[in-house]
Amino acid sequence: MAPVRILSVLLTLGLLAACAPRALTPEARLLSAEVRGLEISQGPALLLGLRVEFHNPNPFPLPLSTFGTRLKVGEVAVPLDLTLPPGRREEVLLVRLTPREALATARALLSREGVEVALEGATLGQHLTFFRTRLSFPLEPPRVRQAGVNFFLENPNPFPLRVEGNLVLLGQSFRVEMDLPARGEGRLQVVGFRPGLERGSGRLELTLEVPGFFRQSLVLYPFMLIPSS
């Protein structure tokens, strides 16, 4: 009789499992994305923030790990350890891109080429793609601002820049270098500038560096020097 009872219990459990409702697949859509800055305290890391709206159609909390959900940003894949409450919910997903693990991805992200971003998972052996898009945040060149005889470089980017190069004026070249804070400015320091060159037009030949990631050259011109009255 014991084997019969065991078989009966197993059959009952099997029927209950078959009747139990399966979890419905959640939905997700990307609302916005931004580069949030550059960490340098523990080595350079570019911070990417993604604002995502999730929808859990089930009447119970749903762990995304159930679907093996992961966020892919170029060559980087980040497993999502989130539990969604029933209904809709917004989350900001942060991704750290370091030169050691994601140099190519970070460089592509800061170029016009951009990088592919996708939220993926799987259920019952089937691949799931919640969303897939391409993000690009090209490096913006600094802007020159004049205040009297002083000139300032404004950095419109959300990360700091190391700037070095030359001011070419009236056939002469003067060394320029500075560190620009994120979305900040710095006074243009010209090494070797001499009186008598205050009036004229020239150009700035600069190399911009995102510390730890890449360097980019550009020329800003015409560059006018106008003495104060």
Predicted regions mapped to residue ranges:
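Sec-dependent bacterial lipoprotein signal peptides
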Residues: 1-17
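Bacterial Sec signal peptide processing site at the extreme N-terminus
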Residues: 18-36
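Short, solvent-exposed loop/turn segments enriched in Ser/Thr/Gly
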Residues: 44-51, 111, 145-150, 199-202
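Hydrophobic beta-strand positions in extracellular immunoglobulin-like domains
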Residues: 53-54, 123, 153, 167, ...
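Asparagine-centered strand-capping/turn motif at beta-strand->loop junctions
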Residues: 54-60, 151-159
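Short, hydrophobic/aromatic beta-strand segments
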Residues: 60-68, 160-166
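Intrinsically disordered, low-complexity Pro/Gly/Ser/Thr-rich segments with frequent PxxP/GP/PP motifs
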Residues: 73-105, 171-197
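Terminal connector regions
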Residues: 99-139, 195-229
